[in-house]
Amino acid sequence: MAYTSKHGVDDMVMLTSISNDAINDNLKKRFAADLIYTYIGHVLISVNPYKQINNLYTERTLKDYRGKYRYELPPHVYALADDMYRTMLSESEDQCVIISGESGAGKTEASKKIMQYIAAVSGATGDVMRVKDVILEAFGNAKTIRNNNSSRFGKYMEIQFDLKGDPVGGRISNYLLEKSRVVYQTNGERNFHIFYQLLAARARRPEAKFGLQTPDYYFYLNQGKTYTVDGMDDNQEFQDTWNAMKVIGFTAEEQHEIFRLVTAILYLGNVQFVDDGKGGSTIADSRPVAVETALLYRTITTGEQGRGRSSVYSCPQDPLGAIYSRDALSKALYSRMFDYIIQRVNDAMYIDDPEALTTGILDIYGFEIFGKNGFEQLCINFVNEKLQQIFIQLTLKAEQEEYGAEGIQWENIDYFNNKICCDLIEEKRPPGLMTILDDVCNFPKGTDDKFREKLLGAFPTHAHLAATSQPDEFVIKHYAGDVVYNVDGFCDKNKDLLFKDLIGLAECTSSTFFAGLFPEAKEVATSKKKPTTAGFKIKESINILVATLSKCTPHYIRCIKPNEKKAANAFNNSLVLHQVKYLGLLENVRIRRAGYAYRQSYDKFFYRYRVVCPKTWSGWNGDMVSGAEAILNHVGMSLGKEYQKGKTKIFIRQPESVFSLEELRDRTVFSYANKIQRFLRKTAMRKYYYEVKKGGNDALVNKKERRRLSLERPFKTDYINYRQNFKLKDCIGDKGTEKVLFADLCNNLDKSFWGSKVERRIMVLTSNAMFLVAIDPNKDKIEKKVKPFLYVLKRRIDFNKIGSITLSPLQDNFMLISVNGEHSNLLECRRKTELIGVLLKHNPSVRIQFADTFNVTLKGGKTCVVKFIRDPQGGDGKVKGTKVSVAPGLPPSSAPNIQAPQETSGGASFTVAEQSYKDQILGAKGGGGGGGRGRGGPSPSGAVSPRPSPGGGGGGPSPFGGRPSPSGPPAAASAPGPEQARALYDFAAENPDELTFNEGAVVTVINKSNPDWWEGELNGQRGVFPASYVELIPRAAAPAPGPSGGPRPAPPGGKSGRAAPMGGPGPMRGRGGPAPGGPGRGGAPPPGAGRAGPPGGRGMPAPGGAAPRGRGAPPPGAGGPPGGGRGGAPPPGGMRGRGGPGPAPPGGMARGGMMPPRGRAGPPPPGM
């Protein structure tokens, strides 16, 4: 993390001076440099810039923060989102982010950026997740004096993920919708956006036509005298809202009913009342109104129904009472409609999966202090007090209490705990503000003044409650400052009641949607249950929220508003300093500097990081405490200075130490995963090439004469480097992204029978088609200097159009590609066997047929007959007119010895006799001494063994001339003693095939072909063990070289060389003749070639470096059994190269395979 003085520090824990002024100054420096994000440990501080900052939220920036640790890049909301997402996946724990701050501080924008990041890194989130914000903002946001798009409700958004980290669902919980905004707005503010969107679209969309007028016509909209918002097109916003509702799943009928209800609320607000002169009221407009009776009269029931006498009275209301009823109905309609919309969104998103991981984002409008603060402000500020209490509990109080409980040395730091203020509002015993208000509301004569009197009487000396000089006000000292509340309307708003006659309207409507908003309408007449108050509902919902947040790993964003004017580049020192103080940033910095950045229980720490330490990764027998200590000691952390051990947890002081530990774990896990991946890929490739080889050769055996080179040629798919040839890919076009199965050069002979030249073609076989591409000279005089040739696609043949492939029964390379309904192609391809094998592997329906006469279909429908004749002088195929002369080849029964990959049980790896893919690519690269590669005669069953390559040979003369290798049996090398190793650590076997030993034990090494797991013997017990747990014990050198005929000694001080080719002198690597049992690399080593190694291993050099590593078969008693790995002779008729694998130990593996994916791998080398 970069720390600079010019633009402040990234993490305020690093401030040299710790004070509120220093924090304020650092934020100001960073704000001036457009660095709006700053850390306090893991807490992110965000200052609203009120402008767009270049490159702050680009796609490139998002990618930069993906998968990075927090300290690697400057502070950003993306870094917090990435940490939250990765922690959820790595720890399998639910996460949440609590975004707090004043209105206009940028809380909603921060939540959007977190959602944007999670959507980008976790894959497609679905259309519902994408459009939900459009609906929520339309119905829940409004323009305020401080914010043009202020959320007027609190929401907790939960995103559900599967174990892979892909989003699968979500849920929204809403809190404290500002219902009063429906009926009243202060000057300069607007009602909810949806009202203005509907009115703006009325002229263009038929679904918005409900006899609507302009906004200034409606009483519920004209009080704020503001109808538009800069930068907001209400007509386009309505279009987006309409489309979003369709995506969510709202039917056309539902949408119509919702917008009809929005219209009804507007017209309901225009209903005005006048005094009727009789103590009641009447509607000023004489036009009929359906709710007239409900608004003008109150239905009062005396007595208890069902218990004796009761009376029902219809009492007229005065204009004020009628207006109150009108507004109460309007607020109830909008509030219930909003809840319905939230529920429909949840129905479309939520999945009921207890295994799903969740990430929650809490965005709730911030602390409010207005000129006149009423019941709504009290509720909002109470919620913010509770959120501040959560922050204190989890970051300040709980941290210090945990140090004490764990026995960690710690000096307590004082901080303001706002629990006393929360108790003042919500406590039941002694009764707090909400409880007192509920008590007053339960009495018929309860009034606002009575509530104030009882409140001040209950807390005459409370430190956070005081009276004012005004008889209708009181003061609460919140954490964010002192707020004066006016009690006017407290009781009515707390009752939050709709009179029964208003609820009864739902039974009179023909709209099922309207009736569904009031499910209690049918029971209202008989229900005896006392309705809950608004205060009770707020306490209940916020306590549920607190419980939900407490189950998650919390993350925090503290949003700060730099000025009251929403102006860019304006930083109000006093305003920001006030927020710094009440947010408790100073205490947060002090505790963070003195505390520990990371703490975790011993068991979780051990199981997460044991992979980084060889002692703990494989076979740890100690307890979790000592295991955690071993891990930290291994990475070089010192006890006391960098970490401390608590009673149940480990504590690490610096976050950089944790990041380093996490990086080391990532590298180690990647290394092991890479080994497993290589093994699986290698196994898959071996199986694939076996099937291709077998399929191609089976299609030709007994049907076509063979060429020796064709039998021994390795398969490697791409012979033209297609994958790196981007110009060729461009020529093929959009098909260049298909998987390439085969690519090679070939000759196209369609016109050669008329004297034309043979056309050279590039053949590319993909998973869908065959492409034939010509290489033509560039005729552009200027361009050809840079691009002398061009690729031209001549033909694309889809697999499903290939009718058949015809070959002759002779040894030539010609093949006729017959295409259904089109002209055919006569091609000459040297690697026809591989091509046919690939075709049959991916398209088994292709017919392979053989004939000595080809009927070639030319372009234009003409045909031509091509005949193949046997001619000793014909070679691989000489074309003359329409005749092709071919020399005799190997018998049609000739076939290579192809052995299938063998699969061992017990979790061991596959072992194969054929060469690996790498060996195939290396192909016929020579190099061998003493006659080169050992090759035997033909294999049994008529299989033809590959012939030697130039410079190589087996026992017997080389067909390319040169001196034959010495005849006669080779001299036997002296057998070395058994190889031994000393145990460095204790190892306890967890599987039946493993060998247990203690530190210092001497193990006889039997097989160390697997670099990670060796096979050994101890006290008569045989098994495998981690190679890194032992060190080899040097053993005595082998006897001096025997008689001449072996490799030439190296010059003094020089490296041991290779034996001379064909057995002659020279610094070549010695290879003996073939061992009994068949062809393969080496057999018994020449005399003096060095002693043999362990079974299946490499031979050891002779003393003084006189001989190279011999790869001959070990002498009797020293080497492995025939076919037992390197040095041993391969099975009869085996492939060239390394010998076949020897028998693997139980649960182990043979030489040449990779480490099997055991339940636990051996420890990595030190320093990994």
Curated annotation (Swiss-Prot):
Compositionally biased, Low complexity: which spans?
Answer: 960-978, 1100-1112, 1152-1161
State a GO cellular component annotated for this protein.
plasma membrane bounded cell projection
The superkingdom listed in its UniProt entry is: Eukaryota
Which residues are annotated as modified residue Phosphoserine in the UniProt record?
S311
- Report the record's Gene Ontology biological process terms: actin filament organization; cellular component assembly; chemotaxis to cAMP; endocytosis
**Record field: compositional bias (Pro residues):** 1040-1052
Residue ranges constituting the TH1 domain according to the UniProt record:
704-892
Q: Which stretches make up the SH3 domain?
A: 976-1035
Return the annotated region ranges for Disordered.
Answer: 876-909, 921-978, 1036-1168
Q: Where is the composition biased (Gly residues)?
A: 924-939, 950-959, 1063-1083, 1090-1099, 1120-1141
Annotated region Actin-binding: the residues are 542-564
Keyword Ribosomal protein on entry:
no
Q: Do the record's keywords include Calcium?
A: no
What SMART domains does the record tag this protein with?
MYSc, SH3
Bias kind Polar residues: ranges: 895-909
The record lists ATP as bound by G101, E102, S103, G104, A105, G106, K107, T108
GO molecular function list: actin filament binding; ATP binding; microfilament motor activity
Write down the CDD domains for this protein, in alphabetical order.
MYSc_Myo1 (cd01378)
List keywords of the entry alphabetically. Answer: Actin-binding, ATP-binding, Motor protein, Myosin, Nucleotide-binding, Phosphoprotein, SH3 domain
Q: How does it assemble?
A: Myosin I heavy chain is single-headed. Dimer of a heavy and a light chain. Inability to self-assemble into filaments.
In UniProt terms, what function does this protein have?
A: Myosin is a protein that binds to F-actin and has ATPase activity that is activated by F-actin.
Q: Which PANTHER family match?
A: MYOSIN, MYOSIN ID HEAVY CHAIN
Q: Other remarks on record?
A: This organism expresses at least three isoforms of myosin I heavy-chain, encoded by genes MIA, MIB, and MIC.
Record's domain comment? Myosin tail domain binds directly to anionic phospholipid membranes; myosins I could therefore move actin relative to membranes and vice versa. TH.2 and SH3 bind tightly to F-actin; this together with the nucleotide-sensitive site in the head, allows single molecules of myosin I to cross-link actin filaments.
Q: What's the protein called, per UniProt?
A: Myosin IC heavy chain
The species this protein was found in: Acanthamoeba castellanii
Instruction: Tell me the classification of the organism that encodes this protein.
Output: Eukaryota, Amoebozoa, Discosea, Longamoebia, Centramoebida
